[in-house]
Curated annotation (Swiss-Prot):
One protein family per Pfam: MIF4G
Listed transmembrane segments: none
UniProt subcellular location: Cytoplasm
Keywords from the UniProt entry: Cytoplasm, Initiation factor, Protein biosynthesis, RNA-binding, Translation regulation
Cellular component, GO, one term: eukaryotic translation initiation factor 4F complex
Superkingdom of origin organism: Eukaryota
Main location: cytoplasm
Name of the protein in question: Probable eukaryotic translation initiation factor 4 gamma homolog
Subunit structure and binding partners: Component of the eIF4F complex, which composition varies with external and internal environmental conditions.
Assigned protein family: Belongs to the eukaryotic initiation factor 4G family.
Annotated segments matching region Disordered: 59-118
Function: Component of the protein complex eIF4F, which is involved in the recognition of the mRNA cap, ATP-dependent unwinding of 5'-terminal secondary structure and recruitment of mRNA to the ribosome.
GO annotation terms (biological process): regulation of translation
Length: 610
């Protein structure tokens, strides 16, 4: 069949051919055509319903069954139907007539069913009449009530249930999280802790600082969440320590900002939880040796609960060792001072059981190198000698841990001393031509510098007054080790030359002046010598004249030195050097009295105008 798509008056430009014989259009040449035969579903004829009524809908009675249809005499309607069938004219096509007659015979055979006998039909009808009689229907229907009976029924009485519910008394000061709220500060902080990785730690810190924490109890709950995650996730413990390093001073709740608190609740709660975990001793060791002391019944009960005991043992051990990991990470980042680590070491050395020894070895392995570098070799020597004496009384596993710790100790080396004057080794000829080695005699201050460096590091992480009070013994140890005048001369030289620790060292001396053994005459000698060294110090440390002026100003404001000595210690450019600290004190309500002890208010007002 050809169809013309585009027609022109003269000739057709495009001609498309379409074969109607293909049922599904053209196919791939390599694939034979698939013939699909669609057969219509067989028509389901409805079954004839058995009715016990006449054609007009009236019910059949017993007398109706004894009619002429059951006799051999045919009715007129049946005779007429038979004659109509006989008088059907034959069609011309005999084949079609034959097929139709066969189909009619099949249908007639299928429709004809054997009729039951007359007695059976009468019996069936009697059974149906008995089954569906009015009495039977009334019995099956159940009890019947009249309208008056229904209206006279009283309402159902309510049964009171007295339930005794015991409610827990809420303790004061304990945070109860609201589970219905998903946008609370605690849930937001937990979400940020879960996001923490090595790559997005800066983003997590930024998001945590943006969270508004209302009360102190909420901040304590957040600190507890961070502590639990830090000790249970050893892979991320160093990242949690970095979080604490960045948030320990700045992150405060709204309630904290209204109070004058030196240490944040967030950092204080973390320290409390860490130290309490070590102080509250938890035993997790194997109870194999303890079973020898048990009776037979106790031993059988222990064997039944062995699996639960093993799980609990693992949780306790992992919690304690996780706390040591977190504590070591905080100390390595200088988040906490040596004072806290010394307290932990002393707590662990009080008892000699295997659990304590294991925790102590684990702690020294993590922080031992830093202790040696910071000049705490005597602590390592004390711990290692104590463990070496008692190692034979422990099991093989603990003994191996002690030997491993002793082997690692040999690889820990102290920090090298700072390079001194490069030209100290040069030889200088005197007037007589004899060579003199200027560096033959070492300055006593070179031995004090490592001690002062260690002290300044510990002061930088001592946030509480108790920590600084423990460090006050360093002044007495420095006096006895190096001498009073050499020690304090080096101490004040470091205070005015190192701007990073200048305020720490000067404030520390003023706070614990009473614990030192230096007299007023010795202090006067040290400060006058320090004033004479300013010309030499300012060559290498240009900031030393300004820091010297601030130092004597602080000493006079705290009444450590007298007014005559203060006037003697002043330099020619003191007024210009001390202007910054005087103005800072004068603008502060808390320190204004300090400024007025140095200058009168009129002089300070003149400085402000200038």
């Amino acid at each position: 069949m050809i169809k013309k798509i585009i027609h022109r008056p003269k000739r057709s430009l495009f001609v498309f051919k379409k074969e109607e014989s293909l049922l599904y259009g053209p196919r791939v040449k390599s694939a034979p055509p698939i013939e699909i035969s669609f057969e219509p579903p067989a028509k389901i004829e409805p079954k004839l319903a058995v009715r016990f009524t006449r054609a007009d809908g009236t019910p059949i009675r017993k007398e109706d069954l004894l009619d002429s249809t059951d006799s051999e005499i045919l009715s007129e309607s049946s005779v007429e139907s038979e004659t109509e069938v006989e008088n059907i004219p034959q069609e011309a096509d005999t084949g079609n007539t034959r097929e139709e007659s066969e189909e009619c015979q099949r249908e007639a055979g299928a429709e004809e069913e054997p009729r039951p006998a007359l007695e059976d039909r009468a019996l069936m009808l009697d059974n149906l009449l008995k089954r569906f009689s009015e009495q039977k229907i009334a019995e099956n229907r159940g009890p019947c009530y009249s309208v008056d009976e229904i209206l006279s029924v009283e309402d159902r009485k309510a049964i009171s249930l007295e339930l005794k519910i015991k409610t827990r008394k809420e303790a004061k000061g304990v945070y109860r999280p609201d589970n219905n709220r998903k946008d609370t500060c605690i849930e937001q902080a937990r979400l940020e802790f879960n996001r923490l990785t090595a790559k997005n730690i800066g983003l997590v810190i930024k998001n945590l600082k943006a969270i508004r924490v209302g009360t102190i109890e909420e901040m304590k709950e957040i600190a507890k969440i961070l502590f639990d995650k830090a000790i249970s996730e050893p892979t991320f413990v160093k990242y949690y320590a970095l979080l604490v390093l960045d948030l320990k001073k700045e992150w405060q709740s709204e309630e904290e900002k209204t109070r004058d608190i030196t240490q944040t609740v967030f950092f204080g709660t973390l320290l409390t939880l860490t130290l309490k975990t070590l102080e509250n001793k938890e035993r997790w060791g194997d109870e194999y040796e303890r079973r020898k002391e048990m009776s037979f019944e106790e031993r059988m009960a222990y064997e039944e609960k062995l699996e639960e005991a093993e799980t609990e043992r693992y949780i306790k051990k992992r919690r304690t060792l996780g706390t040591i990991d977190f504590l070591s990470s905080l100390y390595s980042l200088n988040v906490i001072s040596y004072v806290h680590m010394n307290a932990c070491i002393n707590t662990l050395m009080k008892l000699d059981d295997s659990e304590n020894v294991e925790v102590l070895c684990y702690l020294i392995e993590n922080i031992g190198e830093k202790l040696v570098v910071s000049g705490k070799e005597h602590i390592i020597s004390m711990v290692c000698s104590s463990l070496a004496q008692k190692k034979n009384s422990y099991t093989n596993r603990i003994r191996y841990m002690i030997e491993s710790l002793l082997d690692k100790r040999s690889s820990w080396k102290p920090r090298e001393a700072k390079a001194g004057n490069v030209f100290s080794c040069l030889e200088v000829e005197n007037d007589y031509g004899n060579a003199q080695n200027q560096g033959s005699q070492e300055s006593p201050s070179e031995d004090v510098l490592p001690f002062l460096s260690s002290l300044s590091e510990e002061l930088s992480v001592a946030y509480e007054d108790d920590d600084k009070e423990l460090l006050s013994d360093s002044l007495q140890s420095g006096e006895s080790k190096f001498g009073v005048i050499p020690f304090y001369l080096s101490y004040f030289q470091e205070a005015i030359s190192n701007h990073k620790v200048s305020d720490l060292l000067s404030d520390f001396f003023i706070s614990f002046r009473s614990t030192s053994s230096i007299t007023e005459e010795q202090l006067r000698e040290v400060l006058l010598s320090l004033k004479g060294d300013l010309d030499v110090l300012k060559i290498d440390f240009p900031i030393s004249p300004k820091k010297y002026s601030e130092l004597i100003t602080k000493l006079r404001a705290s009444k450590v030195i007298s007014q005559p000595l203060f006037e003697e210690l002043k330099t020619s450019d003191y007024n210009s050097r001390a202007t910054d600290i005087i103005l800072r004190w004068y603008k502060s309500d808390r320190d204004r009295e300090k400024a007025l002890t140095i200058f009168p208010s009129e002089a300070i007002e003149n400085l402000i105008r200038k």
